[in-house]
Amino acid sequence: MSRSTNKLAVPGAESALDQMKYEIAQEFGVQLGADATARANGSVGGEITKRLVSLAEQQLGGYQK
């Protein structure tokens, strides 16, 4: 578990986010951990962000201001 001070917007989402993180790391061939490079870890974090934005856009569908 991460020691991040960031609060989750949805309580209980941590396990789903962790699962996504490890799936993406496996897809990218990245071993997560203290000995991983910042670039490798960052690539996983960037992909998580892209996928979460995509999921949110799909859920919002045709919503416009």
From Swiss-Prot:
Keywords: DNA-binding, Sporulation. The record marks E23, I24 as: Cleavage. GO terms for molecular function: double-stranded DNA binding. One of its GO terms (biological process) is DNA topological change. Belongs to the alpha/beta-type SASP family. SASP are bound to spore DNA. They are double-stranded DNA-binding proteins that cause DNA to change to an a-like conformation. They protect the DNA backbone from chemical and enzymatic cleavage and are thus involved in dormant spore's high resistance to UV light. SASP are degraded in the first minutes of spore germination and provide amino acids for both new protein synthesis and metabolism. This is Small, acid-soluble spore protein 2. It comes from Bacillus cereus.
